[in-house]
Amino acid sequence: MPVSTSLHQDGSQERPVSLTSTTSSSGSSCDSRSAMEEPSSSEAPAKNGAGSLRSRHLPNSNNNSSSWLNVKGPLSPFNSRAAAGPAHHKLSYLGRVVREIVETERMYVQDLRSIVEDYLLKIIDTPGLLKPEQVSALFGNIENIYALNSQLLRDLDSCNSDPVAVASCFVERSQEFDIYTQYCNNYPNSVAALTECMRDKQQAKFFRDRQELLQHSLPLGSYLLKPVQRILKYHLLLQEIAKHFDEEEDGFEVVEDAIDTMTCVAWYINDMKRRHEHAVRLQEIQSLLINWKGPDLTTYGELVLEGTFRVHRVRNERTFFLFDKTLLITKKRGDHFVYKGNIPCSSLMLIESTRDSLCFTVTHYKHSKQQYSIQAKTVEEKRNWTHHIKRLILENHHATIPQKAKEAILEMDSYYPNRYRCSPERLKKAWSSQDEVSTNVRQGRRQSEPTKHLLRQLNEKARAAGMKGKGRRESESSRSSRRPSGRSPTSTEKRMSFESISSLPEVEPDPEAGSEQEVFSAVEGPSAEETPSDTESPEVLETQLDAHQGLLGMDPPGDMVDFVAAESTEDLKALSSEEEEEMGGAAQEPESLLPPSVLDQASVIAERFVSSFSRRSSVAQEDSKSSGFGSPRLVSRSSSVLSLEGSEKGLARHGSATDSLSCQLSPEVDISVGVATEDSPSVNGMEPPSPGCPVEPDRSSCKKKESALSTRDRLLLDKIKSYYENAEHHDAGFSVRRRESLSYIPKGLVRNSISRFNSLPRPDPEPVPPVGSKRQVGSRPTSWALFELPGPSQAVKGDPPPISDAEFRPSSEIVKIWEGMESSGGSPGKGPGQGQANGFDLHEPLFILEEHELGAITEESATASPESSSPTEGRSPAHLARELKELVKELSSSTQGELVAPLHPRIVQLSHVMDSHVSERVKNKVYQLARQYSLRIKSNKPVMARPPLQWEKVAPERDGKSPTVPCLQEEAGEPLGGKGKRKPVLSLFDYEQLMAQEHSPPKPSSAGEMSPQRFFFNPSAVSQRTTSPGGRPSARSPLSPTETFSWPDVRELCSKYASRDEARRAGGGRPRGPPVNRSHSVPENMVEPPLSGRVGRCRSLSTKRGRGGGEAAQSPGPLPQSKPDGGETLYVTADLTLEDNRRVIVMEKGPLPSPTAGLEESSGQGPSSPVALLGQVQDFQQSAECQPKEEGSRDPADPSQQGRVRNLREKFQALNSVG
């Protein structure tokens, strides 16, 4: 395809590289359908003049202005402006660039109209030709793109060639470019659908006839590619404006912001496309993998690299797949991969060889035999692999490594390209393991490099302002000079500025660069021209892209007839360029959809946005998102979960930007927007738009969109919309399939990456300005929000909900709320159902902000710290906690988007007084909680039985509260005394000692004590965490099952048998002993025995044997009684070992036996026999059935006790029969 005609130059002014003929407009250039007639008469002298020519010598030469005059007449309401305006030679350089932007946009809109009117509507009007699903897959949401760009063209036409107004048009509509993401996601489906159509004779004939009738030299596939190419070029077009715009003039910041915005859009689309390719490749690897016994590969995160290497001492080559969480080693066998091993990145160790520059070794640091000495093909390939392996080792390390330390380690690596140094990819990767680490410890330190980078940029601007004579070239060179010396020279060459390239003399084209490679390969060209060789360097491609193609790519020769096969194969090659290079063992970094320089610029922009985007802005955006505004009316009917939501792109920069929001803004948001726009001449550091761009703050987005489209366009869009709605009416699943075709990217990797984007820490919050004050300069919510991807809660059902505004609180508030929760948790009478004290659900993730750093420690139930529940704690923190709880409730109940009033002076004073005392203890508490939770997850060791003489009383009484889970096991993961010893279980001798200490006067029972207590029998192999004396609620390990066995309530049985003994003694005249009391001095609140009288007790000690066996428990036999006056003692009536090695011991109090009887009991022939046991249990049951309920405050479900006793008897019968 030829480039546009070359124009002469005016004096010393240099003619820019022509932007008229572009990839996006080449179709219309060849199709005789443009509404604009180029002033060719003024160009004729230039072709024969002596000026510097920029014409391109390419095979296709039919793309001059004389061959594409209007044939069908005007097709757009905007074509009346086509020939308007002065000739090119009368315009300044900047004016010509602006004109080029407007005219290329006009031709692009004509191409879109051709797709919608000449293809899509004709298919709709031809019933039976294609099914609605095929139509949706083929065209995607092209009608929405046509509507958006028609409005954008209308805005550009009204700018009167004002560059600031042109730039502001892109800023205002940046929220609506998310529909391009949907289109790009659907583009592979479009290629597949068109290929399938061309296999059908009737459908292929229809498309050929339409092409011939419309006199299009290019097929439909070329037109469907144009939106993908166009959206990736806007930022390059705007860069031409910035290069020739005076930095000191008003509106330069608007131009810069437009560049940033459209670069972010391009980067976002490129990143989503790359993820889609990797996800498809990941599924392909999964299907080709043999002998893999592990989980689905999507659980290991994103596919980072793949390659085939020679391995030392291995005959055949090995293919390595590097994922975010593991390194997979396979052997290629035909088209399949045979699994040979894998090393988790958390256990991966890298050894770089100093002798051989191509070799490096990866090994499992715990298993040295699992070692692979890899030989790369090139030094660049080795550096690429070792760099990413180092990064993943740091990110997956069990310890929390500060972000600055990670960056310092990676910067020491010789391979640390600028693309990764300041790119959004690094921001995402920096927290790739936050989902795992956040449950153990707080998040890493806030990254501060973006701020330094922004300061460097400001200093650079100051230097450029002081040296105006040297122009932009010096600024570009100074920017390049900031690159580290250790980086490869190719990365520096990638940053070659456009101006330095465009100032070169006429450059002969490279025959292999006939089409643009790094954006999307054109679908018709031969593969030799479409795919560059592996040895071709990126800077050569970029030079060709800038110097030869004039910022925009070009189509291949138009005489290619056989386009179907090329489209189905070459496009897919273009979509998987990274995989092709990696499989081929390419030395360079995998290609992307954008040139390296574009990604470098996008990375710089990302860093600037992170430093300037405040936490307050992010909260306001979340509020606005929850209020539901920001979705354009003409966006696709099935909005993409991966699209750039308008509400996430921040507030508008000036008054006209509120047009797209005012339809659905809530009153509160309207107030906040008014404060930001009405009282300040510039918002976020931006100057107001030039008068050349009309500002209409009173018109809603709906009215504006309706007026921007002509009646004919509205009829077209309504017809297409009704077609899809009718299809949805006949097929309920059509809407779901259409939405998936527009927005679906396989889960696995993209889901993890999106959650990482959402877990990015917010920068330091700015002070809340009072009403009427100016907004802080430097905040750029509109453009930064392009990086905020939708959360996993939107993409996948069942994921945790997004972080709400109420959780963004300073650390002091969270600390005091914790103290209030702990104090209320330790108070008597608190039932187990009060899990949502202070408005916090204890089973929801707990978000902790440490010095404005968002960290999350998630447990299955909140675990309080022992320090906070100690009885020596003063009243002041609790009082402050109550005050701050009220404050938090007040803040959380405030309306969205409303500015919060200043805090009460007393609260502020208390906060300052207590913050210094609490901060250190809070940090220790956080670390302790993290360690405990980590130990609980990692520890699978059983509880060791304690020797009889080692029992210690470890805690005082618990405010009279009876235990909720009186199981005699402590958690296996809790160390004793800080030395790693396990807390042992209670032995029989200990039980005797504890009961000997029980003698206290009667004490009225509280409501909590009157309620029956349940014994939980946990049959799992993992120990159950019990309630500690400090008042910590029980939290089972995530590994333990939840099924339990409810034992009878001992207190119920005690009271019933005590009443029976009382009646018996009343009949026999025996004196009564003191009443039964509850112990408050032992850890597990064991019951005390009476001094006299017969009180039957039945308690089970469910013990888990340690690794050395559970032989520490004593053998069955009578226990010596500490109070022999009553003539009674305790007997072990049953001692059974269950199938899961748990030991059940049943003890009963009885009369003191004779020595002979004692010998019989010790040998197992006395009352401990099964017959005696059954008789005693039956006696218990009969007595329980005869006794009525004692107190109404107790659990009314007394009949259930009978069933429990009966079940207990049947269980013992079954166990004895088995034994």
Swiss-Prot record:
Presence of the UniProt keyword Phosphoprotein in the record: yes
Biased amino acid composition, Polar residues: 1-10, 431-442, 1020-1029
Domain PH: residue ranges: 296-394
GO molecular function: actin binding; guanyl-nucleotide exchange factor activity; small GTPase binding
Compositional bias of kind Low complexity: 18-46, 630-645, 859-873
Provenance organism: Homo sapiens
Protein name: Pleckstrin homology domain-containing family G member 3
Ranges of compositional bias, category Basic and acidic residues: 446-463, 696-708, 1049-1065, 1187-1197
Keyword Hydrolase belongs to the record: no
CC per GO annotation: cytoskeleton; cytosol
GO biological process, one term: regulation of establishment of cell polarity
Location of Omega-N-methylarginine modifications: 1107
Gene: PLEKHG3
Free-text function comment from the UniProt entry: Plays a role in controlling cell polarity and cell motility by selectively binding newly polymerized actin and activating RAC1 and CDC42 to enhance local actin polymerization.
Positions carrying Phosphoserine: 76, 433, 576-577, 618, 631, 640, 643, 647, 741, 779, 827, 962, 1011, 1023, 1037, 1040, 1081
